[in-house]
């Protein structure tokens, strides 16, 4: 047998040498395929030989084990027969060991080993029986299963993943017929100096490389997961920051909304007070805001305590007042909280008192009250005349008596007394606050009176000093020339000065005005026309105009900017460059009728516009002009900033409309339109095509009550 194997190996090696010398690639592929088949055969033969060797060794072990077992059983039988006469002697020795206890573990192991061998023989016997009785198809299926299991174990040793376990040479997505065999890269092995290695060594190196690549892939996968986790953490942090920012913004919106509702409630109160249909809550709100207002606006209201307004109110109005007070308390968010809490206590007490009276009148109240009607007046006398501090001490004593619950104490009486005491304490606090407010207003009134008295005393002295200064500056008057003495105007001038110094004479009227001649210039200012006499028709028209200004002072045209409009104008001025100038070419529009429901007077909005000018260096200007003698500037764009601080509907965005002029096509009218109370406003601009790109400076937005429309004109360049 060994000689045959050596001959076979010699033939295969000689065949490999011949195949190695042949330069044909097809023959080399066939040679590799034959070599692979021979390796498979050698491997199968080696496995079969190892299997037979193992079976032979197993049989020899079984035989030797059976011999040992038989030998032990014979010795046991002989020892048992010889131990019967010597049992008495062995039992008499106290230190002799007991054989059954010592040999019991050995017996157990032997029994288990014997049972295992029996089961193994049974399995082997059944397997042999199945092989003997199986059909050729079953035999092929069994060998195929064994081959697949063997291939599975080999792939596991090679480190294949579960993803590639189902691939085979015939069925794989790569189209590789040698997928299961190790790839032999001869050129690479030659470069690396590993061409002399055996196939098994190459397989081991390939397996190590594969395991190293797998570990590297695991590291890459782990790093990718860590990056994804870090990115998720960053996104969560950004989301939390965004949520916090939105929460702050929402709280700001909520605060602005509450402030808006509070301003609207105050505005409604002012309108009702001005129209003579004020509610109790309007007067209370006016009383609370009186501390920050001028003296003359709320002096009449402040002469009485605020709870005096509750006298004579029915139950329905008291309930409405209680709801309104709670609304104001919620809108003001802690401002004047003590005042509103005291008013709630007083209103609730008054409401309970009136409800009790109604129930007694209708005979529906059958429950005994804590205080008898006979002593109600005495209880009121106890509370009357005490300040807030004394009432607070009384409250502590009553609460201590109620919490003590001593024998003989009427708890219901003291509880009713405590409920009334709270209302009296609220009235006392409001009374003290009212007295402090009156003292403050009184001191302010005294200071104003002192200032007025001082001004009245100083005014005549100032006028006399001015007259003396004028006389000193007039040299002609000091010289006293006869021409000046004869001048009637000089005497008249002195008379006027004396009248002004006396501060009681009427204004001088010219003699020609006594005829009742009307002023020919109707556009004369009010101070200049004050000394004129009017006819009855003109006087009536002037009186009506003054009455209208008194009833509606908001309709007076005031060119002075408010602080808010001044702040908006300064904001619009920011970023103004040297090539920009202020632009205010406003055009007239047809009168647009306003709605009857407008709450504010119609008026035009304020604005701050800029015009952007510059040089256009076209071919003609480059030829005829230079930087020392530049061409005339042209309009290159506009920046309109229209202010709408009092816009009623902030959701209605202002709009603009561009209409070319009918008489001149080079100009157009840019009209801005929005809701009440603002009227439309229009400007006359150059009619050219706009640049609507934000990169070119276009802006159309309504932000911070400012409507901004910024644009530049397109520049056309000549191209051949």
Swiss-Prot record:
Keyword terms, alphabetized: Coiled coil, Cytoplasm, Developmental protein, Nucleus, Phosphoprotein
Superkingdom of the organism of origin: Eukaryota
Broad class of where this protein is predominantly found: nucleus
The protein's name in its UniProt record: Splicing factor Cactin
GO MF assignments: lncRNA binding; RNA binding
Biased composition (Basic and acidic residues): 16-67, 113-156, 512-521
InterPro entries associated with the record: Cactin_C, Cactin_central
GO biological process per UniProt: cellular response to virus; dorsal/ventral axis specification; mRNA cis splicing, via spliceosome; mRNA splicing, via spliceosome; positive regulation of antimicrobial humoral response; positive regulation of Toll signaling pathway
Free-text tissue specificity from the UniProt record: Expressed in ovary (at protein level).
Coiled-coil regions, chain positions: 109-159, 206-236, 346-375
Cystine pairs: none
Localisation: Nucleus; Cytoplasm
Source organism (scientific name): Drosophila melanogaster
Any one annotated GO CC term: cytoplasm
Comp. bias intervals (Acidic residues): 465-489, 522-539
Record text on subunit structure and interactions: Interacts with cact.
Location of the region described as Disordered in the Swiss-Prot/TrEMBL record: 1-156, 449-492, 512-541
Composition bias type Basic residues, residue spans: 1-15, 68-78
Short name of one Pfam family: CactinC_cactus
Modified residues (Phosphoserine): 99, 104
Family indicated by similarity: Belongs to the CACTIN family.
Name of the gene this protein is made from: cactin
Function: Plays a role in pre-mRNA splicing by facilitating excision of a subset of introns. Plays a role during early embryonic development. Involved in the dorsal-ventral embryonic patterning. Probably acts as a negative regulator of the NF-kappa-B (Rel) signaling pathway.
Regions of compositional bias (Low complexity) in chain numbering: 79-92
């Amino acid at each position: 047998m060994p000689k045959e194997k050596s001959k076979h190996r010699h033939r295969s090696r000689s065949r490999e040498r011949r195949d190695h010398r042949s330069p044909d690639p097809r023959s080399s592929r066939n040679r590799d395929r034959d070599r692979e088949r021979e390796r498979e055969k050698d491997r199968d033969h080696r496995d079969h030989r190892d299997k037979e060797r193992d079976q032979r060794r197993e049989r020899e072990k079984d035989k030797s084990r059976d011999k040992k077992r038989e030998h032990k059983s014979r010795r046991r039988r002989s020892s048992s027969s010889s131990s019967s006469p010597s049992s008495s002697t062995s039992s008499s020795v106290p230190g002799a060991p007991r054989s059954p206890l010592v040999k019991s573990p050995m017996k157990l192991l032997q029994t288990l080993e014997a049972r295992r061998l029996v089961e193994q023989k049974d399995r082997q016997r059944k397997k042999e029986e199945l092989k003997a009785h199986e059909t050729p198809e079953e035999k092929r299926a069994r060998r195929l299963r064994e081959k697949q299991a063997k291939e599975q174990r080999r792939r596991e040793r090679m480190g294949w993943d579960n993803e590639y376990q189902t691939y085979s040479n015939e069925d794989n997505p790569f189209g590789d017929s040698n997928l299961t065999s190790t790839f032999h890269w001869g050129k690479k092995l030659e470069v690396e100096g590993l061409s002399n290695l055996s196939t098994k060594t190459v397989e081991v190196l390939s397996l190590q490389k594969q395991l190293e690549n797998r570990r590297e892939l695991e590291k890459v996968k782990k790093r990718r997961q860590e990056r994804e986790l870090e990115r998720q953490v960053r996104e969560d942090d950004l989301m939390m920051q965004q949520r916090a920012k939105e929460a702050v913004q929402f709280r700001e919106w909520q605060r602005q909304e509450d402030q808006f509702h509070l301003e609207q409630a105050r505005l409604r109160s002012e309108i009702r007070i001005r129209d003579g249909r004020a509610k109790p809550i309007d007067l209370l709100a006016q009383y609370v805001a009186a501390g920050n207002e001028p003296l003359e606006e709320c002096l009449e209201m402040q002469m009485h305590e605020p709870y005096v307004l509750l006298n004579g109110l029915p139950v329905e109005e008291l309930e409405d007042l209680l709801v309104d007070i709670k609304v104001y308390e919620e809108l003001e968010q802690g401002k004047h909280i003590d005042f509103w809490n005291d008013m709630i206590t007083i209103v609730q007490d008054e409401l309970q008192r009136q409800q009790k009276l109604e129930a007694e009148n209708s005979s529906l109240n059958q429950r005994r009250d804590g205080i008898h009607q006979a002593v109600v007046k005495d209880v009121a006398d106890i509370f009357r005349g005490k300040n807030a501090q004394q009432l607070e001490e009384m409250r502590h004593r009553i609460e201590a008596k109620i919490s003590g619950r001593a024998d003989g104490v009427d708890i219901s009486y003291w509880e009713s007394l405590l409920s009334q005491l709270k209302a009296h304490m609220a009235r006392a606090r409001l009374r003290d606050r009212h007295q402090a407010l009156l003292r403050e207003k009184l001191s302010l009134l005294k200071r104003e009176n002192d200032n007025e008295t001082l001004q009245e005393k100083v005014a005549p002295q100032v006028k006399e000093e001015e007259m003396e200064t004028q006389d000193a500056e007039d040299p002609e008057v000091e010289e006293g020339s006869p021409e000046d003495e004869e001048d009637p105007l000089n005497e008249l001038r002195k008379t006027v000065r004396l009248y002004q110094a006396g501060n009681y004479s009427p204004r001088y009227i010219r003699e020609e005005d006594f005829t009742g001649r009307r002023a020919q210039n109707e556009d004369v200012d009010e101070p200049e026309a004050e000394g004129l006499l009017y006819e009855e028709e003109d006087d009536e028209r002037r009186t009506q105009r003054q009455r209208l200004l008194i009833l509606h002072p908001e309709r007076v045209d005031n060119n002075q900017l408010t602080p808010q409009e001044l702040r908006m104008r300064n904001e619009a001025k920011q970023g103004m460059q040297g090539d920009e100038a202020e632009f205010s070419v406003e055009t007239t529009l047809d009168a647009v009728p306003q709605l009857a429901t407008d709450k504010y007077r119609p008026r035009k909005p304020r604005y701050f516009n800029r015009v952007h000018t510059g040089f256009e260096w076209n071919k003609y200007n480059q030829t005829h002009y230079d930087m020392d003698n530049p061409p005339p500037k042209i309009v290159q764009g506009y920046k309109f900033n229209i202010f709408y601080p009092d816009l009623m509907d902030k959701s209605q965005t202002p709009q603009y409309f561009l209409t070319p002029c009918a008489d001149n096509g080079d100009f157009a009218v840019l009209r801005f339109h929005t809701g009440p109370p603002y009227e439309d406003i229009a400007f006359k601009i150059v009619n050219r095509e706009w640049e609507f790109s934000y990169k070119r400076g276009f802006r159309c937005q309504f932000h911070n009550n400012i409507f901004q429309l910024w644009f530049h004109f397109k520049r056309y360049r000549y191209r051949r």
